[in-house]
């Protein structure tokens, strides 16, 4: 109960799927370079650079080989998606991001999540939630969006359009020098902003 959902990337659709089925458990949303994917708004239908890359390597048969080695390639993959602030990278930082991927079996989610978009496999589950869940209850929650404008995975204009369709009066914060991983690019700005939002709601 009273969950503050703070989500980024795939956290948005996961948060949307959870909250539309259990809105009584959720108090507020903090979205960062993601979308709940329930607003029905799509400002840019062109594939992002990341999903063009996914399509290229899936069609060439090389995707599993690259994403299956995230234990050693995670930084390179994050740079493709939109990680801008390389000054944050230390050995501890690399160890933290590499640790979840000690072997190829551990990379299955990282391989399958982008393929869910590429093959549009997730759409039915989202639509089922919209049809059977309580979208009005979700829309009544306090929400904020933080969006790095150098995101190469999710078009910022799509994240903003989806958010505004659901939460038209909620704050949208954009950051021209941050990318998809805004929590890594601008933590000194983002953390106080989130604390302030929680205190106000």
Regions found by a protein language model. Give the residues of each.
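Flexible "cap/lid" subdomain of the alpha/beta-hydrolase fold that forms the substrate-access gate
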Residues: 1-6, 10-174, 183
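Catalytic active-site module of serine/aspartate enzymes centered on a nucleophile-bearing elbow/loop
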Residues: 168-201
């Amino acid at each position: 109960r009273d969950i503050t959902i703070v989500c980024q990337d795939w956290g948005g659709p996961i948060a949307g799927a959870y909250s539309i089925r259990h809105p009584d458990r959720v108090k507020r949303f903090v979205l960062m370079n993601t979308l709940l994917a329930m607003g029905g708004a799509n400002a840019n239908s062109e594939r992002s650079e990341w999903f063009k890359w996914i399509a290229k390597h899936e069609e060439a048969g090389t995707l599993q080989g690259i994403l299956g080695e995230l234990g050693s390639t995670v930084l390179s993959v994050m740079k493709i998606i939109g990680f801008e602030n390389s000054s944050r990278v230390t050995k501890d930082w690399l160890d933290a991001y590499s640790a979840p991927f000690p072997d190829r079996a551990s990379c299955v989610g990282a391989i399958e999540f982008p393929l869910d978009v590429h093959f549009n496999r997730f759409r039915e589950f989202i639509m089922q939630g919209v049809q059977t869940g309580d979208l009005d209850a979700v829309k009544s929650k306090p929400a904020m969006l933080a969006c790095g404008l150098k995101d190469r995975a999710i078009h910022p204009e799509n994240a903003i359009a989806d958010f505004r369709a659901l939460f038209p009066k909620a704050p949208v914060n954009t950051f021209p020098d941050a990318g998809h991983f805004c929590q890594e690019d601008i933590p000194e700005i983002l953390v106080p902003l989130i604390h302030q939002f929680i205190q106000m709601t």
